[in-house]
């Protein structure tokens, strides 16, 4: 009996039976009835619906949260599992008070539907006891809606409307069923403090389906560069992943995180650039993961492995190169000043700079040849300090040489005014723009990470001369000046941010020492201070919820795929480590299982990436039109962990009582979209994309409230073209209904670029307390902006 009550409280357990009302009171009241005779068949737990709070806007947390996460079997006295129920769905509309903001709204001509009584629902617990009857009312949607347009923003201090946000995350087919869970009793509950929650049926209100793409499982049949995992049960060869065999859907999920809502058509050049780079890095990380899965003595890493070359081969073979076969003079469509690239091969893929080694790219211009782009990395004693004037050393003369085994270095010689050098000189006469890419190689022994390249914009070549170089031979020097009117490079702004007296600094550390690095607040717009709230670094569970740590693995050193047969944590992740050894996430999964508090592996384990807190120098800043936002003072490589979204974990009943302060309420639910998986199926030969969630496959059970208690994640704004995405992670318990929500970078993010993710609002589905449709413009400024937040 006690166990039945516990499960009912945590999950809003299954409803025993609901007698359908067809041709009855529902139809008499004019309520629209579902198809198939007005009866909606719901699976156990996965199909249970709950009435949503009437809030301004709704966004969901990752898959596996809410009541869809797992099937909880509740037995009655006869020991049988409760039968699948059939529930009559109708439009639900009830007027609720949303606080002072809505009380002040002047809304007229509102028609509310008459309430319709639906037969009470009865919850059955073990032993045949009935907890109580649950009644539901339904009504017609209100017409004569009023459009309320407000300025965008997520800060309560910005004066905008309150919002509840949807976090869209990745899932695949396996997450929709939520079968084979390891723990059916993940939480302990203090019975004296618990009141039975009141689940309700929801009908009619639909939420947006578009957003950050969620990946379905992919299957690779390409033998040359198959991105699959090894066979876990193979005794002949435990470590080598056999390219002659097909990979199962669970073995391959490339993270080239998908497009945002409204951008799947690919009409935007900017969107095409982002999609291509995400595909490239997804393949890179998968190749690296494949190599890291081998025993150390068999790894190619550090022994000539060029994952960028191998990944580019896959993209080129599948026709994913942009601007292939053409040379572009001037701006490359979709490439913006300040864009960062981890590998030089990315410049080739996008058509920014096609030579893989030469520093000067050129094309035919009439009868002459002019330069189209240069890579200035300081290798030729280039002067890179001035942001507007660049002194570039010509190519040739055997200046830059790398000694290879069995080869002798050539003697330096004078540079000649030919090929690229001649093209740069001709650009002076023709006054043609030259793209400049500044490169700074990372000071690390790991060459597989490549260099760091930043697109600086367009320059004009002003003059050139010849002088003696550092090696004693004549070299050509070219002076280029940046064309005015282009955005300033981020590293110039970073220099200003590191000055002793920083303009606009209004708080040194909003975390008050709770984070490893201070998180400052900067406002260069006005005199507004950051909103007051209690900073916390951990998700706050209610008193009645006590997470039960999962079983530990047997590892005493860092967990690896080589120990998949004995490491329980690796086995939970499909027999592979979901991160590269540098901490970058490899692929989007429904849920990532990290090592828990009972595991004996060290803190440096590859399966503890998100448990070390925030490592990046983040700060909040006042935006021009969207309240407070979040940015980073350094470059963020794609796949990097950013932060967790933390707050107070609430049940729906408690969250409904806090509706007056719903700006930071997050409904935990499911979202699934296979748009990126469709793109990956085109990239990788033989891959298949799974189905998307149906319109009715959504539910909600829990909420995270960061209004009064939260961390820096509460300030992250919306964008129609986001650079972050959310991922389910479990480590301190195994209840997939309430996972930790972690933000990861889905792009290479330059310093001081605002960090954003897609709130996934449903257009024309957000209503105020009077039932009127509300509209709010979007000011994200993305090339694929939907122009409306909801």
Swiss-Prot record:
Residue ranges occupied by any SET domain in the UniProt entry: 616-760
Is Transferase one of the keywords UniProt gives this record? yes
Native organism is Arabidopsis thaliana (Mouse-ear cress)
Region (Disordered) residue spans: 251-271
SUPFAM superfamilies according to UniProt? PUA domain-like, SET domain
Give the Low complexity compositional bias ranges: 256-268
Task: Specify the Post-SET domain's residue ranges.
Answer: 774-790
Gene that encodes the chain: SUVH6
What name does this protein carry?
Histone-lysine N-methyltransferase, H3 lysine-9 specific SUVH6
Q: Where is the YDG domain?
A: 330-482
**What family, per the record?**
Belongs to the class V-like SAM-binding methyltransferase superfamily. Histone-lysine methyltransferase family. Suvar3-9 subfamily.
Q: Which parts of the sequence bind Zn(2+) 4?
A: 720, 778, 780, 785
PROSITE patterns reported in the protein's UniProt record: POST_SET, PRE_SET, SAM_MT43_SUVAR39_2, SET, YDG
Q: Which UniProt key words apply to this protein?
A: Centromere, Chromatin regulator, Chromosome, Metal-binding, Methyltransferase, Nucleus, S-adenosyl-L-methionine, Transferase, Zinc
Question: So where does Zn(2+) 2 get bound?
Answer: 553-554, 569, 595, 599
Q: Which residues bind S-adenosyl-L-methionine?
A: 626-628, 662, 664, 714, 717-718
- One Pfam family here: SET
List, alphabetically, the Gene3D superfamilies matched.
SET domain, SRA-YDG
Catalytic function, reaction form = N(6)-methyl-L-lysyl(9)-[histone H3] + S-adenosyl-L-methionine = N(6),N(6)-dimethyl-L-lysyl(9)-[histone H3] + S-adenosyl-L-homocysteine + H(+); L-lysyl(9)-[histone H3] + S-adenosyl-L-methionine = N(6)-methyl-L-lysyl(9)-[histone H3] + S-adenosyl-L-homocysteine + H(+)
């Amino acid at each position: 009996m006690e166990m039945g009550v516990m499960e009912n409280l945590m999950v809003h357990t299954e409803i025993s039976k609901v007698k359908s009302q067809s041709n009855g009171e529902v139809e008499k009241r004019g309520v629209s009835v579902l198809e198939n005779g007005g009866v909606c068949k719901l699976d156990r737990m996965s199909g249970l619906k709950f009435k949503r709070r009437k809030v301004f806007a709704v966004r969901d947390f990752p898959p596996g949260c809410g009541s869809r996460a797992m099937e909880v079997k509740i037995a009655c006295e006869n020991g049988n599992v409760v039968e699948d129920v059939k529930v009559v769905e109708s439009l639900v509309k009830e007027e609720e008070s949303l606080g002072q903001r809505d009380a002040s709204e002047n809304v007229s001509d509102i028609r509310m539907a008459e309430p319709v009584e639906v037969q009470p629902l009865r919850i059955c617990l073990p032993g045949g006891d009935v907890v109580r009857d649950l009644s539901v009312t339904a009504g017609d949607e209100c017409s004569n809606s009023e459009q309320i347009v407000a300025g965008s923003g997520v800060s309560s201090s910005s004066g905008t409307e309150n919002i509840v946000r949807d976090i869209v995350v990745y899932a695949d087919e396996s997450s929709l069923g939520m079968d084979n869970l390891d723990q059916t009793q993940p939480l302990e509950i203090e019975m004296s403090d618990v009141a039975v929650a009141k689940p309700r049926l929801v009908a009619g209100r639909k939420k947006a389906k578009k957003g950050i793409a969620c990946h379905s499982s992919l299957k690779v049949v390409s033998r040359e560069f198959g991105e699959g995992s090894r066979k876990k049960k193979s005794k002949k060869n435990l470590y080598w992943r056999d390219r002659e065999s097909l990979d199962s859907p669970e073995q391959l999920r490339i993270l080239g995180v998908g497009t945002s809502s409204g951008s799947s058509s690919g009409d935007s050049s900017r969107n095409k650039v982002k999609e291509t780079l995400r595909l490239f890095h997804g393949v890179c990380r998968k190749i690296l993961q494949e190599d890291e899965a081998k025993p150390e003595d068999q790894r190619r890493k550090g022994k000539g492995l060029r994952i960028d070359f191998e990944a580019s081969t896959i993209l080129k073979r599948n026709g994913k190169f942009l601007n292939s076969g053409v040379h572009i003079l001037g701006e490359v469509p979709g490439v913006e000043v300040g864009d960062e690239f981890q590998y030089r091969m990315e410049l080739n893929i996008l058509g920014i700079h096609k030579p893989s080694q030469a520093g000067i790219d050129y094309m035919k211009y009439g009868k002459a040849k002019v330069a189209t782009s240069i890579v200035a990395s300081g290798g030729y004693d280039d002067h890179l300090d001035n942001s507007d004037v660049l002194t570039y050393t010509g190519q040739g003369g055997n200046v830059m040489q790398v000694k290879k085994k069995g080869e002798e270095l050539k003697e330096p010689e004078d540079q000649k005014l030919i090929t690229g050098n001649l093209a740069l000189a001709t650009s002076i006469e023709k006054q043609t723009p030259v793209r400049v890419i500044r490169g700074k190689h990372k000071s690390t022994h790991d060459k597989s990470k490549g260099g760091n390249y930043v697109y600086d914009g367009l320059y004009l070549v002003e003059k050139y001369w010849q002088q003696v170089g550092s090696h004693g031979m004549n070299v050509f020097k070219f002076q280029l000046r940046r064309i005015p009117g282009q955005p300033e490079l981020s590293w110039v702004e970073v220099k200003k941010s590191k000055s002793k007296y920083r303009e606009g600094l209004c708080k040194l550390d909003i975390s008050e020492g709770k984070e490893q690095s201070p998180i400052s607040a900067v406002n260069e717009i006005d005199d507004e201070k950051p909103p007051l709230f209690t900073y916390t670094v951990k998700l706050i569970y209610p008193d009645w919820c006590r997470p039960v740590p999962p079983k530990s693995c047997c590892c005493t050193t860092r967990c690896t795929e080589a120990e998949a047969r004995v490491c329980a944590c690796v086995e939970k992740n499909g027999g592979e480590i979901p991160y590269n050894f540098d901490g970058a996430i490899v692929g989007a999964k429904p849920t990532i299982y990290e090592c828990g508090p009972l595991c004996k592996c060290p803190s440096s384990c590859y399966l503890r990436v998100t448990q070390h807190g925030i490592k990046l120098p983040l700060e909040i800043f006042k935006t021009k039109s969207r309240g407070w936002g979040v940015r980073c003072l350094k470059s963020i490589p794609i796949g990097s962990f950013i932060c967790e979204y933390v707050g107070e974990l609430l049940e729906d009943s408690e969250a409904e009582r806090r509706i007056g302060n719903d700006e930071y309420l997050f409904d935990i639910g499911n979202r699934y979209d296979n748009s990126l998986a469709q793109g990956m199926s085109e990239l990788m030969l033989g891959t298949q994309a799974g189905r998307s969630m149906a319109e009715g496959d959504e539910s909600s059970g829990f909420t995270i409230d960061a209004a009064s208690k939260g961390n820096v994640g509460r300030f992250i704004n919306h964008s129609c073209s986001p650079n972050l995405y959310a991922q389910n992670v479990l480590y301190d318990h195994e209840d997939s209904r309430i996972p930790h929500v972690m933000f990861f970078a889905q792009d290479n993010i330059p310093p001081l670029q605002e960090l954003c993710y897609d709130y996934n609002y449903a257009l024309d589905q957000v209503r105020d307390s009077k039932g009127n449709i509300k509209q709010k413009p979007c000011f994200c400024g993305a090339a694929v902006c939907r122009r409306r937040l909801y």
